[in-house]
A protein has these predicted regions:
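Polytopic transmembrane helical bundles with strong interfacial aromatic enrichment
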Residues: 1-159
């Protein structure tokens, strides 16, 4: 798979796990009352945008025949992110004052735990997809045929 376009898939593959890890850290800060909910809520949308860009660009760059596993992982990641967003909004609304009174306390605790677990799944899927992209995506500069005097070996080093 040739990595064309801007931003490149390889750069998104490096950036996305970091963005998700920052989001998880902000969520942990809110959970343990070190931060307010605003940093976690505010960073959720840029993090989601970066994740969806990675998944959508991977879907468009990966051919169905050669890279079916990348396409499946991208679709799974997009699905998980949408579920995580819905869980996050409902968990946020459950903590509002007055709280959601139609849900029992145990259901709210289960909702927050599900949001936390889905966040861990999003991080795991992001790392796995990023690793696959870094393994499969070839930068444009390396995909062009080398001249007779130049040979490329390994990860972009000249022989």
């Amino acid at each position: 798979m040739i990595d064309r376009g801007w931003p490149s898939l390889r750069s998104l593959a490096w950036l996305t796990p970091v963005a998700v890890l920052v989001q998880i850290g902000l969520g942990a800060g809110f959970r343990y009352q070190a931060l307010s909910s605003m940093p976690h809520a505010a960073w959720a949308f840029p993090a989601m945008l970066i994740i969806l860009m990675l998944a959508a660009f991977t879907l468009s760059a990966a051919s169905p025949d050669e890279h079916a596993e990348l396409r499946k992982a991208s679709i799974a990641l997009m699905t998980l992110v949408c579920i995580q967003l819905i869980l996050g909004v409902v968990a946020f609304l459950a903590r509002m004052d007055p709280p959601l009174t139609f849900l029992p306390v145990d259901a709210l605790a289960a909702l927050r735990a599900t949001h936390l677990g889905t966040g861990a799944l999003v991080f795991g899927f992001t790392v796995a997809l990023s690793a696959q992209i870094l393994r499969c995506a070839v930068p444009v500069a390396l995909s062009e045929p080398a001249q007779a005097s130049e040979q490329w070996v390994g990860n972009g080093r000249r022989k």
